[in-house]
Protein backbone atom coordinates (compact mmCIF):
# COMPACT_ATOMS: atom_id res chain seq x y z
CA UNK A 1 0.00 0.00 0.00
CA UNK A 2 1.28 3.45 -0.89
CA UNK A 3 1.16 6.63 1.16
CA UNK A 4 1.24 9.76 -0.98
CA UNK A 5 1.50 13.46 -0.15
CA UNK A 6 -0.02 15.67 -2.83
CA UNK A 7 -0.24 19.45 -3.04
CA UNK A 8 -2.29 21.12 -5.77
CA UNK A 9 -1.59 24.84 -6.12
CA UNK A 10 -3.61 27.06 -8.47
CA UNK A 11 -1.44 29.90 -9.81
CA UNK A 12 -2.46 33.34 -11.01
CA UNK A 13 -5.75 33.47 -9.13
CA UNK A 14 -7.62 36.74 -8.63
CA UNK A 15 -6.91 36.77 -4.87
CA UNK A 16 -4.24 35.25 -2.59
CA UNK A 17 -6.88 32.97 -1.04
CA UNK A 18 -7.09 29.56 -2.70
CA UNK A 19 -9.44 27.77 -0.30
CA UNK A 20 -12.26 27.64 -2.87
CA UNK A 21 -9.96 25.71 -5.20
CA UNK A 22 -8.71 23.46 -2.40
CA UNK A 23 -12.34 22.66 -1.56
CA UNK A 24 -12.93 21.62 -5.17
CA UNK A 25 -9.86 19.38 -5.12
CA UNK A 26 -10.94 17.87 -1.78
CA UNK A 27 -14.39 17.13 -3.22
CA UNK A 28 -12.79 15.12 -6.05
CA UNK A 29 -10.79 13.11 -3.52
CA UNK A 30 -13.80 12.50 -1.26
CA UNK A 31 -15.76 11.20 -4.23
CA UNK A 32 -12.96 8.69 -4.93
CA UNK A 33 -13.49 6.92 -1.59
CA UNK A 34 -9.73 6.73 -0.95
CA UNK A 35 -8.58 7.11 2.65
CA UNK A 36 -6.99 10.53 3.06
CA UNK A 37 -6.17 13.31 5.47
CA UNK A 38 -6.35 16.99 4.54
CA UNK A 39 -3.63 19.10 6.18
CA UNK A 40 -2.83 22.80 6.07
CA UNK A 41 -0.13 22.27 3.44
CA UNK A 42 -1.31 19.30 1.38
CA UNK A 43 -3.23 16.05 1.46
CA UNK A 44 -2.01 12.59 2.47
CA UNK A 45 -3.63 9.68 0.63
CA UNK A 46 -3.19 5.96 1.26
CA UNK A 47 -4.18 3.01 -0.89
CA UNK A 48 -3.39 1.30 -4.16
CA UNK A 49 -0.84 3.38 -6.07
CA UNK A 50 -2.65 3.10 -9.41
CA UNK A 51 -5.91 4.29 -7.83
CA UNK A 52 -4.12 7.18 -6.11
CA UNK A 53 -2.36 8.33 -9.28
CA UNK A 54 -5.64 8.18 -11.18
CA UNK A 55 -7.40 10.42 -8.66
CA UNK A 56 -4.42 12.79 -8.49
CA UNK A 57 -4.86 13.42 -12.21
CA UNK A 58 -8.49 14.39 -11.54
CA UNK A 59 -7.43 16.55 -8.58
CA UNK A 60 -4.90 18.35 -10.80
CA UNK A 61 -7.59 19.07 -13.41
CA UNK A 62 -10.17 20.42 -10.93
CA UNK A 63 -8.87 24.02 -10.64
CA UNK A 64 -8.89 24.32 -14.45
CA UNK A 65 -12.63 23.60 -14.37
CA UNK A 66 -12.94 26.59 -12.01
CA UNK A 67 -11.25 28.95 -14.46
CA UNK A 68 -7.63 28.71 -13.29
CA UNK A 69 -5.13 28.88 -16.17
CA UNK A 70 -2.10 27.35 -14.41
CA UNK A 71 -1.78 24.63 -11.77
CA UNK A 72 1.32 23.28 -10.03
CA UNK A 73 0.95 19.83 -8.45
CA UNK A 74 3.63 18.25 -6.24
CA UNK A 75 3.60 14.54 -5.41
CA UNK A 76 5.68 12.54 -2.89
CA UNK A 77 5.21 8.78 -2.97
CA UNK A 78 6.15 6.29 -0.24
CA UNK A 79 5.59 2.88 -1.84
CA UNK A 80 6.84 0.34 0.69
CA UNK A 81 6.66 -3.26 -0.51
CA UNK A 82 8.06 -5.20 2.45
CA UNK A 83 5.11 -4.49 4.76
CA UNK A 84 1.79 -2.68 4.77
CA UNK A 85 2.11 1.00 5.61
CA UNK A 86 -0.48 3.53 6.68
CA UNK A 87 -0.79 7.16 7.66
CA UNK A 88 -1.49 6.19 11.28
CA UNK A 89 1.35 3.67 11.34
CA UNK A 90 3.90 6.29 10.33
CA UNK A 91 2.71 8.69 13.04
CA UNK A 92 2.50 5.95 15.67
CA UNK A 93 6.08 4.84 14.96
CA UNK A 94 7.45 8.33 15.57
CA UNK A 95 5.34 8.86 18.70
CA UNK A 96 6.56 5.55 20.15
CA UNK A 97 10.13 6.67 19.66
CA UNK A 98 9.30 9.96 21.40
CA UNK A 99 7.76 8.09 24.32
CA UNK A 100 4.30 9.58 23.74
Spans of features found by a protein language model:
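Charge-rich, low-complexity N-terminal segments
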Residues: 1-100
Amino acid sequence: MAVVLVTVVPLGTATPSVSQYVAGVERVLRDSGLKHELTGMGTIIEGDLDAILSVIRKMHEQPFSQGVLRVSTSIRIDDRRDKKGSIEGKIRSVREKLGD
